[in-house]
């Protein structure tokens, strides 16, 4: 059981952001490779801890090696993987995913997609003697809630179907077999040329669609004829900014609304997945958008998943960046347990389980911890966000530390309340004695009796209320 890998990447400041005269301009102050302090436009500070933070001087190679390489390697070995770039328009999603160009780009600037393609075929060629591989490539765009085949534009409305053994499928989508990275990149370039490009005030060439690159890697073992299939999906999401900020109108406004609807659906699915069982049962609204439906297997756990939160470093975009980072924090709590989709030989299926008692206990413990954290994380996160203590609940150890801290603080304040009450009791006792003495001095036995009855009943009600 592993968490989703969530990283943030701050691109260099644009020339417009550099010209901003109102501030020194930068909203993130690095603490270490995983943690930074974020300052919003009201100068409130939030500390974020993610799996890795890439600042403006980070290289494309570093992002690939940390975020994508392990997922690509597993996909070649039959474990599904998904890599998503998320963030507002102009935050660096496409730069991170593709680089300045897929084919004719210098080595240094190459994005995740061409690196994944090269890495995949390199790994395949180094293990060709133990297995035969078949790689197929598809490429689709989700635009205005329609899935369009970017490798065959006549297929403008691909249907999404579900199959018990293969999971989510794009019915009739073009799947081109590719035998090396040059061929794969050529097809990707064809697909990219077909991508719908809209215009908004914020970025004259911003893409207004989600784009998914899908690789199916089938491995036929030379030795025992076992077949493993790994699906690797890379998704470059459309920009997540608010429609009103773009100043868009007409069709562009409709595009922005549709994009926001599908990104909200993605947020809702993540919320449902990370909120634990609810009164409504655990309904996960995958069907609310094409995007969440296509990502259903990835989000539902049968896939390794990495999310790159692309951010502007500028205070001008602080509110969008804050919501991007909060989205990332939320996604971090999705639990994934990807399995290799291996078709076993009959002999392998008969083999007795070699799982030890300790391993079973470990698994049960993990499940218990998982349930506990699912229920507690939301409450804790809300409290800590309110208190300005944004944190990363990476492990149960962290949950326990946080709990211990809260419990000890609660005990301290209860102790203080008990001390105050004891002092109050002492003061009242002294007053009581004084009143009784006064009554005796006045020689009024009847009044003393009434007074003492009054005091005892007041005393009793004080301590039972
Ligand atoms: N890490 C980076 N290093 C250098 N330049 C970058 C980096 N990230 C982004 N840029 C530049 O910033 C600009 C916007 O980036 P990009 O087009 O990737 O944004 P985007 O998030 O994909 O936007 P959209 O939602 O419109 O697709 C581009 O000119 C890009 O070259």
Curated annotation (Swiss-Prot):
Keyword Manganese assigned: no
InterPro entries in alphabetical order: Kinesin-like_fam, Kinesin_motor_CS, Kinesin_motor_dom, Kinesin_motor_dom_sf, P-loop_NTPase
Domain Kinesin motor per the UniProt entry, residue ranges: 3-334
Subunit comment: Homodimer. Interacts with WIP1 and WIP2.
Function: Kinesin-like motor protein that promotes synapsis and is required for proper crossover distribution in meiosis. Plays a role in the nuclear division cycles during megagametogenesis.
Disruption phenotype: Partial seed abortion due to defects in megagametogenesis. Defects in pollen viability.
Pfam families named in the record: Kinesin (PF00225)
Biased composition, class Basic and acidic residues, residue ranges: 341-358
Protein name: Kinesin-like protein KIN-1
Chain spans, region Disordered: 338-358
Lineage of the organism: Eukaryota, Viridiplantae, Streptophyta, Embryophyta, Tracheophyta
Organism, scientific name: Arabidopsis thaliana (Mouse-ear cress)
Entry's Gene Ontology BP terms: homologous chromosome pairing at meiosis; megagametogenesis; microtubule-based movement; pollen development; seed development
Keywords: ATP-binding, Coiled coil, Microtubule, Motor protein, Nucleotide-binding
Gene designation per UniProt: KIN1
GO molecular function (one): microtubule motor activity
Residues in coiled coil: 402-444
PANTHER family given in the database record: CENTROMERE PROTEIN E, KINESIN-LIKE PROTEIN
Cellular component aspect of the GO annotation: microtubule
Tissue spec: Specifically expressed in ovules and anthers.
Similarity comment: Belongs to the TRAFAC class myosin-kinesin ATPase superfamily. Kinesin family. KIN-1 subfamily.
Positions annotated to bind ATP: 87-94
Keyword ATP-binding applies: yes
């Amino acid at each position: 059981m592993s968490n989703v890998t969530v990283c943030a990447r701050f691109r260099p400041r644009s020339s417009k952001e550099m010209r901003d005269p109102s501030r020194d301009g930068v909203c993130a102050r690095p603490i270490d490779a995983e943690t930074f302090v974020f300052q919003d436009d009201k100068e409130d500070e939030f500390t974020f801890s993610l799996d890795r933070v890439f600042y403006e001087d980070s290289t494309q190679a570093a992002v690939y090696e940390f975020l994508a390489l392990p997922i690509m390697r597993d996909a070649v070995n039959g474990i599904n993987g998904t890599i998503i770039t998320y963030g507002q328009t102009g935050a660096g999603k496409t730069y991170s995913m593709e680089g300045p160009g897929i084919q004719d780009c210098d080595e240094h600037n190459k994005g995740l997609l061409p690196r994944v393609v090269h890495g995949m075929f390199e790994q395949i060629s180094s293990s060709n003697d133990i297995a035969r591989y078949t790689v197929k490539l598809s490429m689709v765009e989700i635009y205005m809630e329609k899935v369009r085949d970017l490798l065959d534009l006549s297929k403008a409305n691909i249907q999404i179907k579900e199959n018990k053994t293969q999971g989510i499928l794009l019915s009739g989508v073009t799947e081109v077999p590719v035998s090396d990275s040059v061929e794969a990149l050529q097809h990707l370039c064809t697909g990219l040329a077909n991508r719908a490009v809209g215009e908004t005030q914020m970025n004259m060439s911003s893409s207004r669609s989600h784009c998914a690159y899908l690789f199916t890697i089938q491995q036929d073992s030379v030795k025992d004829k076992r077949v493993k299939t790994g699906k690797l999906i890379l998704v470059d999401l459309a920009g997540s900014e608010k429609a009103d900020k773009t100043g868009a109108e007409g069709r562009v406004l409709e595009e922005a609304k549709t994009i926001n609807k599908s990104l909200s659906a993605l947020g809702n699915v993540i919320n449902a997945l990370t909120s634990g069982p609810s009164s409504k049962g655990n309904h996960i609204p995958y069907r609310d958008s094409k995007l969440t439906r296509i990502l259903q297997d990835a989000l539902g756990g049968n896939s390794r998943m990495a999310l790159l939160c692309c951010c502007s470093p500028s205070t001008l975009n602080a509110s969008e960046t804050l919501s991007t980072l909060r989205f990332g924090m939320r996604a971090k709590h999705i639990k994934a347990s990807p399995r290799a989709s291996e078709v076993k030989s009959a002999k392998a299926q008969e083999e007795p389980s070699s799982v030890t008692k300790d391993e079973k206990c470990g698994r049960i413990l993990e499940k218990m911890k998982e349930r506990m954290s699912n229920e507690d994380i939301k409450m804790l996160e809300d409290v800590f966000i309110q208190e300005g203590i944004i944190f990363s609940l990476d492990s149960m150890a962290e949950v326990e530390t946080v709990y211990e801290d809260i419990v000890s603080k609660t005990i301290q304040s209860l102790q203080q309340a008990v001390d105050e009450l004891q002092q109050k009791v002492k003061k009242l006792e002294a007053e009581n004695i004084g009143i009784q003495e006064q009554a005796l001095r006045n020689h009024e036995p009847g009044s003393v009796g009434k007074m003492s009855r009054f005091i005892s009943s007041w005393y009793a009600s004080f301590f039972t209320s």
